Amino acid sequence: VVLSGCSEDAMDRINKDHGHTQSVAGRFILTDVITSTAFSNAGGDLNTYLSSYIEYEVGVDNQLYYAETRESEPTSSSTFNNTWNNLYSTLKSARIIINQCSDGGIDYGNYTTKGMAEVLAAYNCALIADMFGDAPCSQAALVDENGSPVYLNPKMDKQEDIYKQAMQYLDDAIADLQQEDLIDPSSQDLLYQGDAEKWLKFAYALKARYTMHLLQRSTNKDADMEKVLEYVSKSFKNTEEQAAFSVYDVNNINPLYGFFKARAALGASESMRSKLAEYNDPRLS
């Protein structure tokens, strides 16, 4: 008979994964959050289906044809399933950056990175509110120090409360983006290469957008319109400052072009062409 034993510390180490890192610097997570926000959330199924619903383009084949004819896609639970999952995955990553850059976190002191993540968290929260109305948000996409969900069944939030969360993220971002980082995130920032002033303008642009979204619910529209004008004055001055995800090339194709090339499911919209002609829009030529 052979008996063996080990210390309690050794037993504690057995079930730990030593082959993978347990934490990543926030600036590296930032690259993924920017990419998934632009490519999958703003440029994925929401882009293709909604362009058909509002007649920017016309669905001519496969699922976009069914979206065009309203046969099944608008009400099918699977239509936006991928986007739904990715919105929360992206929001989770943004919140991880925010937590790591907050007091006590491994990236504490990197205020610019934190501000960038707060802008992106606001953007994704607002996408959830715009597309799904009431939805989990305040308790969703939160993880503990071990990466496990804090809430397995997050509560439903009212759409208006999700907007409040988005606006709070933007207010926090505006404060943080006017401070500095201990480590330069420019090489991981695919939007503005670490330019905090442009991120600040992006934050104000979103505040203007979301304030306008809520105007029909406003109790003082005149005051809120003044806020919109104030936010706009602090935002982009030209199209070169806009938050454009300009990384596409022959090896990294735009998701809309990739979808069209693979499936040819979208065509030119007569409704859109007629509207451009009505206003003598130069883009027709």
What residue ranges belong to the model's regions?
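Conserved, well-structured interaction surfaces
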Residues: N62-A135, P149-K164, Q168-E180
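Membrane-proximal, proline-rich intrinsically disordered regions
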Residues: C6-E55, Y88, G104
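Hydrophobic-face positions in mid-chain alpha helices that act as interaction patches
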Residues: D222-S285
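Aromatic- and glycine-enriched pocket-lining scaffold segments that form the walls
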Residues: Q188-E240
